[in-house]
A protein has these predicted regions:
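Short beta-strand/loop motif that positions the catalytic acidic residue
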Residues: 181, 187-189, 193
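Short beta-strand element of the alpha/beta-hydrolase
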Residues: 24-32
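Catalytic nucleophile-loop/oxyanion-hole region of alpha/beta-hydrolase
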Residues: 39-40, 45, 58-94, 233-238
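Mobile cap/lid helix-loop segments that gate and shape the active-site cleft of serine hydrolases
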Residues: 5, 142-177
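Primarily recognizes the serine-hydrolase "nucleophile elbow" in alpha/beta-hydrolase
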Residues: 78-152, 169
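Conserved alpha/beta-hydrolase "acid-adjacent" motif
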Residues: 194-203
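C-terminal catalytic histidine-bearing segment of alpha/beta-hydrolase fold enzymes
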Residues: 202-256
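N-terminal cap/lid segment of alpha/beta-hydrolase-fold proteins
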Residues: 1-21, 151-152
């Protein structure tokens, strides 16, 4: 399905219906790929996991470079608005919409959860009157920190911002702009990740804690970057079960 009703924006959102549905929540998924591409195993792969545990999900093919900021964020806001506006159609509670992303998709997830300023390109139709604020965020080895920290994934920021890189990289650092309005979070990462430093996760969790935002975080000692559901790393693969438990803990999923 197309998120925008004009030819200028071709963003697609794909619905994955739960098998044996046992939740009225929905997960909106933004795959990773350094804002240069979108990795299928971090989109469809996650959606298939949610299908298996009875939770509806949506995968968003948001814009990437050379379609720079704010277009990816416009797409992300539009996706949440679409799901919320169509909640009855999909059997979803409009106040139980989580956003989820890995790597750069994790940055988009966290940016959506923390960056609230109006953006040129909104207010194109009635859908833009619907709230874009998610009710929870799920971050998998997410890019968070800006390049000046020394622990950033610089390529993701450059692909997101283009010519706005120098002027805006701190403005889109979720650890700097989190607030008490930021939604609750589930975060996981691996300490051995040499693509995105695990301190990104620690810093964001600490920022959320300072803002009084509930956060659950898991760090596994081993495992490379980009694992997805981690089928070849049994110890890391526990994260999916931990996420299922968290959804039950916050009241978003019935216990099996």
């Amino acid at each position: 399905m197309k998120l925008w009703q004009n030819n200028e924006h071709d963003t697609e959102i794909t619905f994955y219906e739960a098998k044996n549905k046992c939740s009225d929540a929905a997960i909106v998924i933004f795959p990773g790929g350094a804002y240069a591409m979108r990795a299928e195993h971090e989109g469809k792969g996650y959606a298939e996991f949610f299908q298996s545990i009875g939770v509806n999900s949506f995968v968003v093919d948001y814009h990437v470079a050379p379609d720079y900021f704010p277009q990816p964020l416009l797409d992300a806001r539009r996706a949440v608005r679409f799901v919320r506006a169509n909640a009855e159609k999909y059997g979803i509670n409009p106040e139980k919409i989580a956003v989820m992303g890995s790597s750069a998709g994790g940055h988009l997830t966290a940016m959506l959860s923390t960056y609230y300023a109006p953006i040129e390109g909104e207010d194109v139709d009635e859908l833009d009157k619907v709230s874009f604020m998610p009710n929870a965020q799920i971050l998998c080895y997410a890019v968070i920190r800006n390049p000046d920290t020394g622990i950033s994934h610089e390529g993701s920021f450059r692909n997101l911002l283009g010519e706005k890189y120098d002027a805006m990289n701190k403005a889109v650092d979720p650890a700097l702009i989190a607030s008490p309005k930021t939604p609750q979070a589930f975060i996981w990462h691996t300490a051995a990740d040499d693509g995105v430093n695990v301190i990104n996760a620690y810093d964001y969790a600490a920022s959320l804690k300072r803002c009084g935002v509930p956060v659950e975080m898991h760090v596994f000692p081993d495992g490379r970057h980009g694992l997805g559901v981690a089928p070849d790393f049994p110890h890391v693969a526990q994260w999916t079960g931990l996420l299922k438990n968290w959804l039950e803990y916050i009241g978003w999923k019935n216990e099996e």
